[in-house]
Swiss-Prot record:
Domain of life of the native organism: Bacteria
Entry annotated with the keyword Nuclease: yes
Catalysed reactions listed for this entry: adenosine 3',5'-bisphosphate + H2O = AMP + phosphate
Coiled coil: none
Pfam families according to UniProt: DHH, DHHA1
GO molecular function: 3'(2'),5'-bisphosphate nucleotidase activity; exonuclease activity; nucleic acid binding
Name by which UniProt lists this protein: Bifunctional oligoribonuclease and PAP phosphatase NrnA
Gene behind the chain: nrnA
Class of this enzyme: hydrolase
Function: Bifunctional enzyme which has both oligoribonuclease and pAp-phosphatase activities. Degrades RNA and DNA oligonucleotides with a length of 5 nucleotides and shorter, with a preference for 3-mers. Directionality is controversial; shown to degrade 5-mers and less in a 3' to 5' direction, and 11-mers in a 5' to 3' direction. Converts 3'(2')-phosphoadenosine 5'-phosphate (PAP) to AMP.
Organism for this UniProt entry: Bacillus subtilis (strain 168)
Keyword terms, alphabetized: Exonuclease, Hydrolase, Nuclease
Length: 313
């Protein structure tokens, strides 16, 4: 499949890369890392990375603005996005051919060409693997691409602490870090936290609920976000902070936005992506998300999570 992707990429003069809404480091790393590789390899081609910028990650890369006409005859590549409704910039079907590169379970097999590898730690890891295959075809990796891909791997592996970190992951990271970017500066930019977000994190620890079966939950409503001067995105990024609490088997964050309640599931053992799918979401076995539209649904999610944790005893 990698060879077919490389061959297809070589055929198009215009290539537009997308990723998911509310991007994380892996979304930026895979989309923009591949953008840099292709620009370095094919300077004669028109290569664009599109989507709504995420302010906390804007230091990684500047995205492009593309008019509708540019999609005519273009190859569109979507990175790190399992479901079509989560693709940032819904013009993605407007090109001549659509390619999906992802590491989530392939529940929505959209696109003309698909490369899905659920064993990969991140799509950024997959992009580096694609580059290694592409080297035989003249592909080039510059320092910016290496930094972006490394950032994506770091983000999705939780700084190499999550169980999705493999021998291959560490091998690739070791090769990427040989490029002349500052990994320490990158870590500082990725993980430096504003004081108001730290205070919100304190609120989270003070208000977490934990059942005897190991199901934990936190509710962050709009008035709480306003009190601490934080965004829903900043609050959602704190979901991993509960992972070190003794006795937790799985947990859920509810973050209220203007038109929905964002739900973030995490687990130390029970498989939770089936629960996320039940509420029109999805994701990985131990890290998933969904969106709901009433607090009654939140109560049902808590009941389901409780059952899931109890059955995992």
């Amino acid at each position: 499949m990698k060879t077919e992707l490389i061959r297809t990429i070589s055929l198009y003069d215009t290539i537009i890369l997308h990723r998911h809404v509310r991007p994380d480091p892996d979304a930026y790393g895979s989309q923009c890392g591949l953008t840099e590789i292709l620009r370095e390899t094919y300077p004669e081609k028109n290569i664009f990375a599109v989507g709504t910028p995420e302010p906390s990650l804007s230091f990684l890369y500047s995205l492009d603005e593309v008019d509708n006409e540019t999609y005519e005859g273009a190859l569109v590549i979507v990175c790190d996005t399992a479901n079509q409704e989560r693709i940032d910039d819904q013009r993605y079907p407007s090109g001549a051919k659509l390619m999906k590169i992802d590491h989530h379970p392939n529940e929505d097999p959209y696109g003309d060409l698909l490369w899905v590898d659920t064993s990969a730690s991140s799509v950024s890891e997959m992009i580096y693997e694609l580059y290694l295959e592409g080297k035989e075809h003249g592909w080039k990796l510059n320092t910016k691409a290496a930094e972006l891909i490394y950032a994506g791997i770091v983000g999705d592996t939780g700084r190499f602490l999550f169980p999705n970190t493999t021998e291959k992951t560490l091998k690739y990271a070791g090769e990427l870090i040989q490029y002349p970017f500052s990994s320490s500066e990158l870590f500082n930019q990725l993980y430096e936290t504003k004081l108001n977000v730290v205070k919100l994190n304190g609120f989270i620890f003070q208000n977490v609920s934990l059942s005897e079966n190991g199901a934990a939950s936190v509710f962050i409503k709009k008035d709480t976000l306003e009190k601490f001067g934080t965004t829903a995105s900043e609050a959602s990024q704190l979901v991993g902070t509960l992972g070190n609490i003794s006795g937790i088997r799985a947990w859920v964050f509810f973050v209220e936005e203007d038109d929905q309640i964002r739900v973030r599931f995490r687990s130390k053992g029970p498989v939770i992506n089936g629960l996320a799918r039940k509420y029109n979401g999805g994701g990985h076995p131990l890290a998933s998300g969904a969106s709901i539209y009433s607090w009654d649904e939140a109560d049902r999610i808590l009941a389901d999570l409780e059952t899931l944790c109890k059955e995992h005893e």
